[in-house]
Amino acid sequence: LDEIQMVEEVDNPYLPGNSGSKITFVDVLLGLKGLSNVDVYVTGSNSKMLSSDVATAFRDRGEEIHITPLTYDEFHAAYPKEKRFAWREFVTYGGMPLVMQKSTHGEKSKYLQDLFRLTYIKDVIERNRLRADAETLDELLNVVASAVGSLTNPTRLSNTFRSVKGLKIKNETVSAYLDCFIDAYILGKSYRYDIKGRSYIDTPLKYYFTDIGLRNARLNFRQ
């Protein structure tokens, strides 16, 4: 049920004729606790709660389940067209489930681009109370998207903004922005396995998008 918290209270069906007895969705959820074959899952927008908040808000009372976009195996199993085209579709549009409901390239690309424009960027700014404008975050994501597979770090990215865009953004600020995207499961990062101790500090690493379709959408499917 989407936006369940907006549902108004209703008359208690177990007490007909008693107009003063009302129940809400909370009462319904509490009633499910006594059933042995029912699991209750609560989800929310990035702007409202991230995984880092779960440990605090639901300490010892819940378990986090990290749901990723579809893997290729899952995508292939659900792909409605000829299976020989599944890989090409997957590496182009990724594994966001709703992509599979779109028919044309235009519909799929618009959906993925709108996720950034209307949801992800706004959520990250709102959730983290960032001073950065959406354009700066857009540019950072574009740089990371075009450099997937290349070693980089916040210092190099900061220098890129300064030399190419003429924007002075401290490497600490770039690092903080990247961490926001990682917390929102938009990006991930991979360290070199052969680095030890203090060498980890500012050593180049690789950033990647959790969904290849989202990465391609950042570049308007040019690469």
What are these regions (language model features)?
Residues I4-Y41:
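Conserved Walker B catalytic segment
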Residues N37, S45-S47, S51-L151, T155:
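Interdomain motor-coupling "hinge/lid" segment immediately C-terminal to the ATP-binding subdomain
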Residues V7-E9, M49-S51, V99, A217-R218:
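Short catalytic/ligand-binding loop motif for oxyanion handling, primarily in non-cytosolic enzymes
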Residues H105-G106, K110-Q223:
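Accessory nucleic acid-recognition modules appended to NTPase machines
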Residues P13-P16, F25-D27, A55-D60, K81, ...:
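Short, glycine/charged-enriched secondary-structure capping and boundary segments
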